[in-house]
């Protein structure tokens, strides 16, 4: 069959084309308005066309776009300093994506042990259901066969244990183990939240056995759970953390953050990125932090998250034949469906609401952090109509 497009057939795209965005709304080419609770898969943290981000990007575009890391870039120094001031980290390496940030995190952990003379320590313990990216290393780290199949031998040095099972983690540690890599909330895996006790247990195991704790906060970070980073809810600090998505507010940007000790092996020439930390990305990243770190912003995220949580709980009670479970924290939420999630997704899209599929028959709600309580209630009303259409039942309006 002749191809109808010159594009790779790697995406199952919805038959929708959007012309522009305004806040939490996307406007299709035919003028139809969609309430966007997908946010580019948790990327558009401040919605679409946020004026402060637009202004920052335009101002930088008039100056210089790209320099490479042959030279100092003022925006990198500024953004890195701000990130280290509000996190555990002392050092930052900028990337263009989450997968690149994870690659840097893995390399940082392995170099840490190499620099100490422990060349045998390069194995990383990861978790079943994880998703860390699409590079050869990160699909091996995720361990899901559907992403590994057909790409040759799995990259060595990764092994998976059940998510949330601290005993299995301890049993997997041996003389070759370098680090533990975990998502505080598994996104692609179905919005599965690690308990505080599990996160604390991982930190304790790393301290006990001399391992590095790597957190993948690509999806859960930058305010999405109501804290700047999700691990803060557990009261722990990692050694290395991968960040992306929301930090760029829609512009390609990622970062690997590390303590001084963890980053000690990453000397000149050990890693690099042609585009990483480019002036345009740095301008937008700094603008995102201007908003997210403003006084009261995360309080507002937590307030609107409560509206969602209460409304979704009501929908679950009213439509038990459609909704099995509500998952997640803050504005990283999941609806585990009893019906096929594809059927519920179709009904939701018919209500001009955008959400994101995930594993375990789950649909993700990842609204922009600027979503208001009124917009949250509008989205819940659309979810109610979708659930009603799938269930065939009627009832009172959702909260």
Swiss-Prot record:
The modification N6-(pyridoxal phosphate)lysine is found at residue 245. Its cofactor is pyridoxal 5'-phosphate. Keywords: Amino-acid biosynthesis, Aminotransferase, Arginine biosynthesis, Cytoplasm, Pyridoxal phosphate, Transferase. GO terms for biological process: L-arginine biosynthetic process. It is found in: Cytoplasm. GO terms for cellular component: cytoplasm. InterPro entries: AcOrn/SuccOrn_fam, Aminotrans_3, Aminotrans_3_PPA_site, Class-III_PLP-dep_AT, PyrdxlP-dep_Trfase, PyrdxlP-dep_Trfase_major, PyrdxlP-dep_Trfase_small. Pathway: Amino-acid biosynthesis; L-arginine biosynthesis; N(2)-acetyl-L-ornithine from L-glutamate: step 4/4. The keyword Transferase applies. It comes from the Bacteria. The keyword Transcription regulation does not apply. Pyridoxal 5'-phosphate binds at residues 98-99, 131, 216-219, 274. Its EC number is 2.6.1.11. It catalyses: N(2)-acetyl-L-ornithine + 2-oxoglutarate = N-acetyl-L-glutamate 5-semialdehyde + L-glutamate. Its main location: cytoplasm. It holds the Pfam family Aminotran_3. GO terms for molecular function: identical protein binding; N2-acetyl-L-ornithine:2-oxoglutarate 5-aminotransferase activity; pyridoxal phosphate binding. Belongs to the class-III pyridoxal-phosphate-dependent aminotransferase family. ArgD subfamily. May also have succinyldiaminopimelate aminotransferase activity, thus carrying out the corresponding step in lysine biosynthesis. This is Acetylornithine aminotransferase. It comes from Rhizobium meliloti (strain 1021) (Ensifer meliloti).
């Amino acid at each position: 069959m002749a191809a109808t497009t010159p594009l790779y057939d790697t995406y199952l795209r919805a038959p929708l084309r959007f012309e522009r965005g305004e806040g939490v709304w996307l406007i299709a080419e035919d003028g139809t308005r969609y309430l966007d609770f997908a946010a580019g898969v948790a990327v558009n943290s401040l919605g679409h066309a946020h004026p402060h981000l637009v202004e920052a990007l335009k101002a930088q575009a008039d100056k210089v776009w790209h320099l490479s890391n042959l030279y100092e870039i003022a925006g990198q120094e500024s953004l890195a300093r701000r990130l280290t001031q509000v996190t555990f980290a002392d050092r930052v390496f900028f990337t263009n994506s989450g997968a690149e940030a994870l690659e840097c995190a893995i390399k940082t952990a392995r170099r840490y042990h190499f620099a100490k003379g422990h060349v045998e320590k390069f194995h990383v313990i990861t978790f079943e259901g994880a998703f860390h990216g699409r590079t050869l290393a990160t699909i091996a780290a995720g361990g899901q066969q559907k992403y590994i199949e057909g790409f040759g031998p799995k990259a060595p040095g990764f092994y998976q244990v059940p998510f949330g099972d601290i005993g299995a983690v301890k049993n997997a540690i041996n003389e070759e183990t370098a680090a533990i890599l975990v998502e505080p909330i598994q996104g692609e895996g179905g919005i599965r939240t690690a308990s505080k006790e599990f996160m604390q247990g991982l930190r304790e195991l790393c301290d006990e056995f001399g391992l590095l704790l790597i957190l993948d906060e690509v999806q859960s970070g930058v305010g999405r759970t109501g804290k700047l980073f999700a691990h803060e809810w557990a009261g722990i600090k990692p050694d290395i953390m991968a960040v992306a998505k929301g930090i760029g507010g829609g512009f390609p940007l990622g970062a690997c953050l590390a303590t001084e000790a963890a980053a000690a092996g990453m000397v000149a020439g050990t890693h690099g990125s042609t585009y990483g930390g480019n002036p345009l990305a740095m301008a937008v990243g700094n603008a995102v932090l201007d908003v997210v770190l403003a006084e009261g912003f995360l309080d507002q995220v937590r307030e609107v998250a409560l509206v969602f949580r209460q409304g979704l709980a009501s929908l679950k009670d009213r439509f038990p034949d459609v909704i099995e479970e509500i998952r997640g924290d803050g504005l990283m939420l999941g609806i585990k469906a009893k019906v096929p999630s594809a059927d519920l997704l179709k009904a939701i899209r018919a209500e001009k609401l955008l959400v994101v599929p995930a594993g375990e028959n789950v649909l993700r709600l990842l609204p922009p952090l600027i979503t208001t309580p009124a917009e949250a209630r509008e989205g819940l009303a659309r979810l109610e109509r979708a659930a009603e259409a799938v269930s065939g039942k009627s009832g009172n309006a959702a909260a």
